[in-house]
A protein has these predicted regions:
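Conserved catalytic core of nucleotide polymerization and phosphodiester-bond processing enzymes
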Residues: 1-282
Length: 282
């Protein structure tokens, strides 16, 4: 537990479902974007996007579920587990035992059917990376992303202009089923990506979405500090500041948090805020 200094209070906010929103935006999943925009405008429980996802999973009319419906949890876990080509194993990380494998397989199939643009993105970004490695120097575009091989790196340029660099990329596999591998230091030392199995559409998509979400958080941090809110910590997509008692408001904090950068004007962004004498994540 973290306590504010005497005479001070903590104020914080976190983005709402930011990866789901960014994924829908990058892919151009129109119904999902409309669902978030509608909910942000109305805050009607029947418009809650995880409820809408659940309606599509169970093939019932929109508005059939609310935030109190148990089916909403299925919609939420589907979004968390399946957005990057995940299946049963990904599901089990979020919900270990309530449903059978056959039920989870059906959820996955229904989720993919209801998200055609996201499915298309997985394969498009994988193909774009492969073309960029084969044809070094060529800029290959995939939606708002630009990919290029240069100087021993595969460079994935995000909408913000920031680049994610993948060292020593190469194409491996037979002519019909090639994929890109690169050196990965995620474990603290450079090894072949995924033990030599290489990258795939879900991995590229996760990197893109996480990178964009990071850029949104970084720009929000700069705005918030410039407005006089000193940041004391951030956890995932949450920012926490310590301010003198009576300074600022959660309403202003949210406005600062969700202000859209010029490169993401069509991305629906929302946040929730809190204030109090102590911070406890649990």
């Amino acid at each position: 537990m973290i306590n504010a200094a005497p005479g001070h209070t903590l104020i914080g906010a976190d983005f709402s479902a930011i990866e789901s929103r960014v994924l829908a935006w990058v892919a151009g999943e129109a119904w999902k974007l409309d669902s978030y925009r509608r909910f942000d405008a109305t805050h009607d429980p029947a418009d809650e996007p995880y409820c809408e996802t659940a309606c599509r999973i169970f093939r019932v009319p929109s508005g059939s579920y609310t935030k109190d419906s148990p089916e909403r949890a299925v919609g939420k876990v589907c979004d968390l587990a399946f957005g990057y080509m995940g299946g049963i194993n990904a599901w089990r990380k979020f919900e270990p035992g309530r449903f059978t494998d056959d039920e989870v397989k059906k959820f996955c199939s229904e989720w993919r059917t209801s998200h055609p643009a996201i499915r298309k993105l997985w394969y498009a970004v994988d193909r774009a990376a492969l073309v960029a490695v084969r044809e070094r120097g060529r800029v290959v575009r995939c939606g708002p992303i630009a990919i290029k091989s240069a100087g021993g790196f595969l460079l994935l340029k995000l909408p913000s202009g920031r680049k994610i660099s993948y060292p020593l990329p190469r194409a491996v596999g037979d002519a019909e089923r090639q994929h890109v591998t690169f050196l990965d230091n995620a474990a603290g030392q450079f090894t072949e990506c995924r033990g030599g199995h290489g990258a795939y559409g879900g991995l590229w998509t996760e990197n893109v979405v996480s990178g964009i979400a990071r850029d949104l958080l970084a720009e929000a941090m700069l705005r918030i500090e410039a407005a006089g809110y000193p940041i004391v910590l951030h956890v995932h997509d949450e920012i926490v500041c310590e301010v003198p008692e009576g300074f600022g408001s959660t309403e202003e904090f949210i406005r600062l948090m969700i202000r859209k950068p010029a490169w993401a004007l069509e991305l629906p962004i929302a946040a929730s805020a809190w204030s109090g004498p102590r911070y406890c994540k649990g």
